[in-house]
Amino acid sequence: RGLGDVYKRQIKDGRYLTNKARGVGVYQNSDNMLNLKSFEAGLTNLSKEQFPTKSYVFREGQILSKDTVENWLDRKTKDNPDGLNPEDNGKKEADKRNPIYVQQIEEQDYMQEKDGKLSLAGVTIGIGMNQKDYYQKEEYGATYTTDISTEKMKEEGQKAAATILARLRQKSEIGNDTPILICMFKQAPNDSLVGGSFYAYALSKNGTSISSWTDTDIKSVVLPATDSSSVPNENDATSFSAFMNKTQSFFPNLAGVTAQAQYKGKELQGMHVNITTQFYSMTEITSFTQFVSQMARTYLPSGVPVDITIKGSDGTVQAFLSRDSGQNSYYTHVFNSY
């Protein structure tokens, strides 16, 4: 992927500033790391519309500490009055217990230069909401699931957003007038082959009220699709199936060809293809990579960014192909071992 539309990063005293709540997201998404990838990438993309890369410098979140975020994500108790999730009502039945609604929170800071100094000019907060809450009735016991309706998820998300906004306004570095972009994310279930997606955002230019929410209309789908009607554009599903069939028929030693595609409405925004092989020789991998490049140019949708990762059955990345939205040909790289 080209590095055209990316933020400059803030470096302080020759060191990169890591997020103060670093590691919380990994723990919160340990059962489906695709959620974390989709969450972080999507959050930065939504921020670009509000805080353009030409005018702002990116800083990892420095205002919310790890302890603060962990307390907010926990249940509300006497010892933790700041918990955004409801207190445990003691019930064990899936439809009677109080589920965990808010699963993850991430802060991103956007800086601008004034008089040779960088100062905070905007904050983005991502809030990840559960559609399913997984729990055990006893320690180390079986895992059960509470389903959360879309309506309830959105209602609890707006409550959490209002509380977080009010708390951020009390932070001295943010104050009353720093724009805060709040982005709402729907977590994918643990067994999903794609990460979740952002469903709404709101901008607070100042104060603690959120005047309106904007729907993103973003959706992630897995290809090949078991039901083509679940893909916003059926032509993309057909194109991918042709690519998959050609690729698999040419090389018999393939374990699988899948893709994650992201849509905004019916418009494809990008695609990441994963191919698992059982190749061992360098010549096989190189020949296969050349073939995949030709098939991708022929069959995969044009005009959008596409990444293709070729992995061995042990998970080792053997080759990588990439094409930006304005390009026809693919950049390819085969990983040698020395």
What residue ranges belong to the model's regions?
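Short, small-residue-biased leader/transition segments that mark boundaries at the very start
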Residues: 2-7
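N-proximal, solvent-exposed amphipathic alpha-helical segments enriched in charged/polar residues
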Residues: 8-134, 150, 154, 158, ...
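Solvent-exposed coil/turn segments that connect beta secondary-structure elements
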Residues: 128-132, 185-187, 278, 313
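Short, non-transmembrane amphipathic alpha-helical segments
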Residues: 146-174, 283-305
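Hydrophilic extracytoplasmic domains
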Residues: 228-233, 240, 244-338
